[in-house]
Amino acid sequence: MNKSIAVLGTGAIGSCVGADLTRAGYDVVLIDQWPAHIEAMKAHGLRVQLPDAELHAAVRAFHLCEVCTLKAPFDIVLMTAKSYDSTWLAEFIKPYLKADGVLVPVQNSLNDEWVAPIIGAERDVGCVVELSAEVFTPGVVQRNTAHEKAWFGLGELNGGITPRLRELEAIMKNVGRVSLTQNIMGAKWTKLISSSMLLGPLGVLGLKLWEATEVPGVLELLIRCGTESMLVARALGYSIEPIFGLSAADFAGSTEAVVKKLANTIVLHGKAGTRVRGVSLQDYLKGRQTETGCLNGLIVAKGKQAAVATPANAAVVQVDREICAGARQPGRANLARLQQLIG
């Protein structure tokens, strides 16, 4: 436990990670740009509300402007910020990462593509995360996913199973279950496909995950977005990695069959947690930018690169822009707008 660890971006996911590693006895600091959250953690520690328990961690929290006061560089940086903040945060933390240190983007999207060139690919380890949480009150995080159900997939960008990967596995087991993969980009693409189905679409519709089957036409929209995303991934030559407890056999069928299986599996998981709100919906409620551009928007950009049409994903991006601009509110009425844009 002698490794120095920074959790960079301590919103909902970062707060959960930072609390667990602190409670496990690691040398860890939490860094964030939300002043009230940092001040609350400095004064009272961090409260983590689980479905059946409440935990407290006496964390070490720092404002971004205080990082320059830290005396030693970090062995490990767990970047848990929004995807659209990845580039500048990677530049920001680069001087504070040891030459032989490692940065792990514990985020949605394909962040390694733009983080690795900044810090060096040899210092980047890929990660896929399955953990739902939200934070609206400074110093208090609602963790929706219990430890035994949370999951992290870790992998070297070159596909190797290395000693540092084993070390990260041991560390992250304090937060949830961990798997090591030799196909981390395939796993990240699977998560991107699922995110393109769920986060943006359900966010603009103002729906929780379990409500996806309650409104006619919504599940079909999700499957349409996911099918486009998987077609893009396959056109670009990625081998999709099974996650969410699915097997290789579940991913062996046609693109549409695989996406339907993935969508139904995730929605079924959502029915077990009716208080869970997707991160895009949380962002709308907070009045801030969503990650939809880094998810569905990335699918649209990659689709152009692969010559694969992505009208459903493009529609989600457009409605997200309209909501962020104040032209409309998230809600079920946006389904008609999405269908109009898709044509």
Task: Give residue spans per PLM region.
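Rossmann-like NAD(P)-binding element
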Residues: A57-L97
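A short helix->loop->beta-strand "cap" motif at the edges of active sites that frequently abuts
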Residues: K98-V102, E122
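Active-site-proximal catalytic alpha-helix in oxidoreductases
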Residues: M185-T213, G217-L231
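Rossmann-fold dinucleotide-binding core
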Residues: A72, V106, L110-M197, L202-L205
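NAD(P)+-binding Rossmann beta1-loop-alpha1 motif at the extreme N-terminus of oxidoreductases
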Residues: M1-A53
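Conserved SAM-binding loop
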Residues: L30, L78, P105
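NAD(P)-dependent Rossmann-like dehydrogenase/reductase catalytic/cofactor-binding core
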Residues: N2, I223-G343
